[in-house]
């Protein structure tokens, strides 16, 4: 069976591995920035449809030692591309190069393209065209320490692009990271979920999709595998229809968010409607100082407060973190989580975290802090 590699934000590898095991993937091995696994084409479809924390699902097809652009070209040119492409395909190459004798990512991608096109020109008299916007077959080149891996990109656009968030507030976290953080809390829909600093509403929307068993890729119109020679449209349609039939229609417990900013609340409600769940939840305007958990069974409270990326902002944000500590203190029985990129601000909460997970939000070193008031 083919080998695959699903990429994710650093720190989410254990969560992604758990997702893959739930999909019955074989030989699941977490790595740096992703998880390797083995499976058939059906599993590849399910991975793209169901994975909440993955960014891309890649199928490595060529690995070699290359120390120069010329060596890279030759390795690619000598590969049997008739197994995966025809001259009628359009292609694009995305590349990432580090710690290598090949120093320029764009030039490396160009040499891969040249190798593929020359292969077809010499064998068939025609070559694939390049379409960087929407290629029929996307390729991903990764070179580290002179070791190259060239993969087919089965996802196309990044899987974090769910399609429900055209409207964003300042500095949102992406959907895949938000879903991963919710999953990292252990929450699966069996208790209430609240966000007192909801921003775009991403935690709550991703949480609702988890509780409803709603696959994040359900309404996506194009995946990279749809341009592959071995794509089975009948099998894919059957799988997606079954996923739609398996969804719940109502939330077992409340999911809600609030924010002091009117624009954020309006954006969050619009995003929830775009996600098809606007009728199941409502975002309201509250100052966090006035936030109280509702009566009833305790659940999970999760938020992503600002963490002062610019010089001098720490002092302005300390009262907000102290207020979060007060909110947590009056929420006995609830498990409270803060995702922050500033450990000194996290200390302003005034409680000792019972758990600390280390992750990255882009290039920012962050922590998910868990508190039990």
In which residue ranges do the predicted regions lie?
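Conserved S-adenosyl-L-methionine
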Residues: 173-292, 309-310, 314-316
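Short beta-strand/turn micro-motifs composed of small residues
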Residues: 8, 259, 340
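SAM-dependent Rossmann-like transferase core, predominantly class I methyltransferases
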Residues: 150-184
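Non-catalytic nucleic-acid substrate-recognition regions in nucleic-acid-modifying enzymes
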Residues: 1-137
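Phosphate-coordination loops involved in phosphoryl transfer and adenosine-cofactor binding
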Residues: 87-90, 190, 251-252, 298
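C-terminal catalytic and target-recognition region of SAM-dependent MTase-like enzymes
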Residues: 287-373
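A short, flexible beta-alpha/helix-coil linker loop
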Residues: 98-101, 158, 306-310
């Amino acid at each position: 069976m083919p080998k695959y590699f699903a990429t994710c934000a650093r720190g989410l590898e254990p969560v992604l591995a758990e997702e893959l095991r739930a999909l019955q993937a074989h030989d699941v091995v977490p790595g740096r920035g992703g998880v390797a696994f083995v499976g058939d084409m059906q599993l590849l479809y399910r991975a793209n449809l169901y994975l909440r924390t993955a960014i891309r699902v890649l199928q490595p097809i060529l690995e070699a030692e290359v120390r120069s652009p010329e060596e890279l070209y030759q390795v690619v040119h000598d590969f049997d591309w008739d197994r995966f492409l025809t001259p009628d395909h359009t292609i694009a190459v995305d590349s990432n190069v580090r710690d290598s004798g090949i120093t320029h990512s764009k030039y490396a991608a160009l040499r891969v393209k040249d190798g593929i096109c020359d292969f077809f020109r010499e064998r068939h008299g025609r070559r694939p065209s390049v379409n960087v916007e929407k290629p029929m077959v996307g390729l991903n080149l990764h070179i580290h320490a002179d070791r190259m891996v060239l993969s087919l990109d089965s996802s196309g656009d990044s899987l974090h692009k769910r399609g429900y968030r055209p409207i964003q507030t300042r500095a949102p976290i992406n959907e895949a990271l938000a879903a991963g953080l919710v999953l990292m809390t252990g929450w699966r829909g069996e208790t209430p979920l609240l966000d007192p600093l909801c921003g775009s509403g991403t935690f709550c929307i991703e949480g609702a999709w988890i509780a409803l068993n709603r696959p994040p890729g359900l309404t996506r119109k194009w995946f990279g595998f749809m341009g592959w020679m071995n794509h089975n449209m009948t099998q894919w349609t059957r799988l997606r229809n079954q996923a739609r039939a398996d969804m719940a229609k109502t939330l077992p417990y409340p999911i809600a968010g609030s924010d002091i900013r009117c624009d954020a609340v309006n954006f969050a409600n619009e995003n929830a409607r775009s996600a098809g769940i606007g009728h199941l939840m409502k975002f309201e305007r509250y100052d966090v100082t006035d936030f109280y958990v509702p009566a009833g069974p305790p659940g999970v409270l999760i938020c992503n407060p600002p963490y002062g990326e610019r010089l001098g902002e720490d002092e302005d944000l300390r009262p907000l973190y102290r207020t979060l500590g007060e909110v947590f203190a009056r929420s006995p029985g609830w498990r409270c989580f803060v995702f922050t990129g500033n450990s000194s601000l996290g200390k302003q909460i005034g409680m000792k975290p019972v758990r600390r997970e280390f992750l990255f939000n882009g290039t920012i070193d962050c922590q998910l802090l868990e508190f039990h008031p």
